[in-house]
Amino acid sequence: MSQNNTISSMNPERAYNNVTLKNLTAFQLLSQRENICELLNLVESTERHNSIINPERQRMSLEEMKKMLDALKNERKK
């Protein structure tokens, strides 16, 4: 049996479940992390989402980055 036949006969779901950091997007990585936290009951479900993906912290970080970018643009113009 050739290697191609082996791959095609393999369950596609099983191949998809082979998760490494190289083949994950940021969203997938956070989703996997959230699933692990839920599985291990590391945080309660109400806290789980906010502890992993904290929207308020992300907004603050975005605003800080925008201010830094504007400062760098103004500095460059001088």
UniProtKB/Swiss-Prot annotation:
GO cellular component, one term: nucleus
Organism: Saccharomyces cerevisiae (strain ATCC 204508 / S288c) (Baker's yeast)
Keyword tags: Acetylation, Cell cycle, Nucleus, Transcription, Transcription regulation
Top-rank lineage group of the source organism: Eukaryota
Modification N-acetylserine occurs at: 2
Example GO BP: nucleosome disassembly
Name the record gives this protein: High temperature lethal protein 1
Protein's UniProt keywords contain Acetylation: yes
Main subcellular localisation: nucleus
Assembly and binders: Interacts directly with RSC8. Component of the two forms of the RSC complex composed of at least either RSC1 or RSC2, and ARP7, ARP9, LDB7, NPL6, RSC3, RSC30, RSC4, RSC58, RSC6, RSC8, RSC9, SFH1, STH1, HTL1 and probably RTT102. The complexes interact with histone and histone variant components of centromeric chromatin. Component of a fungal-specific module (HTL1-LDB7-NPL6-RSC3-RSC30) within the RSC complex.
Note: Present with 3550 molecules/cell in log phase SD medium.
Function: Required for cell cycle progression through G2/M transition at temperatures higher than 33 degrees Celsius. Component of the chromatin structure-remodeling complex (RSC), which is involved in transcription regulation and nucleosome positioning. RSC is responsible for the transfer of a histone octamer from a nucleosome core particle to naked DNA. The reaction requires ATP and involves an activated RSC-nucleosome intermediate. Remodeling reaction also involves DNA translocation, DNA twist and conformational change.
Annotated compartments: Nucleus
